[in-house]
Amino acid sequence: MLVLFGNFYVKQYSQKNGKPENGATPENGAKPQPCENGTVEKRENDTANVRPTRPAGPPPATYYDSLAVSGQGKERLFTTDEVRRHILPTDGWLTCHEGVYDVTDFLAKHPGGGVITLGLGRDCTILIESYHPAGRPDKVMEKYRIGTLQDPKTFYAWGESDFYPELKRRALARLKEAGQARRGGLGVKALLVLTLFFVSWYMWVAHKSFLWAAVWGFAGSHVGLSIQHDGNHGAFSRNTLVNRLAGWGMDLIGASSTVWEYQHVIGHHQYTNLVSDTLFSLPENDPDVFSSYPLMRMHPDTAWQPHHRFQHLFAFPLFALMTISKVLTSDFAVCLSMKKGSIDCSSRLVPLEGQLLFWGAKLANFLLQIVLPCYLHGTAMGLALFSVAHLVSGEYLAICFIINHISESCEFMNTSFQTAARRTEMLQAAHQAAEAKKVKPTPPPNDWAVTQVQCCVNWRSGGVLANHLSGGLNHQIEHHLFPSISHANYPTIAPVVKEVCEEYGLPYKNYVTFWDAVCGMVQHLRLMGAPPVPTNGDKKS
């Protein structure tokens, strides 16, 4: 059932014909030029990319106070395109809310490790807010602030509700009461998974066993779910080096951890189930809803094609190709183009170390997963073993990731605010029940944390076994609200998240069983595959 997802708005900022206020000039007085496809070749001769000098003295008293720059007495204004050009670690800028920050000298000091390089050249408001549940590091950030963004536009609303701040406070308090650290707690599980992974690899390669190839697929999926996923979110350990090593688990499977980080951390987590229109110079798109398009239609704002009416039938065979496609094709396309959809991947893939990691891991996996089995057992048998291993891994991973967002219980959004967002009778009933218990003002529907609750669905919430078998993805709501918290802690904070959601009138959606969640996904695919119903304004042919 389709209903209008109303009451959305976007905060527009006046640009006054593109000129800064109070007579201030753009950086170096240069007219900003658009960045073409994220290329960096123009930087050497681009006068608009000379790094401004930071003012001396202590940081401002408050987060939004102005900095005195070059004696002008006002902050400099920068455009989004100017920020985009500073995307490499040797010259890296980022934005948070309306502030522009030159973090080049801070990258090596960042307590969270190298994850900050993912945000270079782009808006990091969501990353900074969601990865610092104990509070935004304003004092540190102000040391690197160089100006204000002249043209900030975003779908999301910030600071208009206490929902997310209160949720953070109460979730962290619950962890403290339970004596659980925010990160870590996965060492024993990781050891068991890696042991099974390497033993099963040896068995299927050395003894041409299809059974062990399937076991490797299961173990490999858990390297992805339980090790690299937490590692690349900075949640596997309190040690940043250990997190980085855990994040390379994706490379261990045969896919690229770098490409995955851009798609998952930068794309999916920031813009969950969101499709952008032309309002934004940097589109706010969730790449996951386009991951199988046009073969499959997952978002109501993507165009329908006749073969989509059968997508609920061929979805599961297609899901099984997830890791094979990443190992053999899609990762290479991203590395060569430096783009994942609308996401510029230059900050990690241009530097030499990024190239060495990508190509080195790909070569090693090609030799160990394809060449060696083919050499030992013949080409046909070697490729068959490789296929079985990755079909099992791909199916397991795809289902675990997809059923939490592509579901009849999830919202699907568009930055134009005119799309019809899908709500089922179950979701409406849950919303009405939550409204009856509401004790606090309902946040605006485009509050970022609210959209995460609306676009995610849990299954078997609170279940410890389900939590470990899914790498915490059965607690999808908790994961999206607190990506830097270890999935081992999700059963602990889930009751708090549910309680706060109900207090603010937000439906906390949870399927009782895994099978219910799978059925919710299939039902959504059926609805997205049905031919669109003509409206009154449509002309009859």
Swiss-Prot record:
Heme binds at H110, H132. Residues 75-150 form the Cytochrome b5 heme-binding domain. Its cofactor is Fe(2+). Its EC number is 1.14.19.31. Keywords: Electron transport, Fatty acid biosynthesis, Fatty acid metabolism, Heme, Iron, Lipid biosynthesis, Lipid metabolism, Membrane, Metal-binding, Oxidoreductase, Transmembrane, Transmembrane helix, Transport. GO terms for molecular function: heme binding; metal ion binding; oxidoreductase activity, acting on paired donors, with oxidation of a pair of donors resulting in the reduction of molecular oxygen to two molecules of water. Gene3D superfamilies: Cytochrome b5-like heme/steroid binding domain. It is an enzyme of class 1 (oxidoreductase). It catalyses: a (7Z,10Z,13Z,16Z,19Z)-docosapentaenoyl-containing glycerolipid + 2 Fe(II)-[cytochrome b5] + O2 + 2 H(+) = a (4Z,7Z,10Z,13Z,16Z,19Z)-docosahexaenoyl-containing glycerolipid + 2 Fe(III)-[cytochrome b5] + 2 H2O; a (7Z,10Z,13Z,16Z)-docosatetraenoyl-containing glycerolipid + 2 Fe(II)-[cytochrome b5] + O2 + 2 H(+) = a (4Z,7Z,10Z,13Z,16Z)-docosapentaenoyl-containing glycerolipid + 2 Fe(III)-[cytochrome b5] + 2 H2O. It is a multi-pass membrane protein. GO terms for biological process: long-chain fatty acid biosynthetic process; unsaturated fatty acid biosynthetic process. InterPro entries: Cyt_B5-like_heme/steroid-bd, Cyt_B5-like_heme/steroid_sf, Cyt_B5_heme-BS, FA_desaturase_dom, Fatty_acid_desaturase. It comes from the Eukaryota. Signal peptide: none annotated. It is found in: Membrane. A motif (Histidine box-3) lies at residues 476-480. The chain crosses the membrane at residues 186-206, 209-229, 314-334, 356-376, 383-403. Belongs to the fatty acid desaturase type 1 family. PANTHER family: DELTA(5) FATTY ACID DESATURASE C-RELATED, FATTY ACID DESATURASE 2. The cytochrome b5 heme-binding domain acts as the direct electron donor to the active site of the desaturase, and does not require an external cytochrome. This is Acyl-lipid (7-3)-desaturase. It comes from Euglena gracilis.
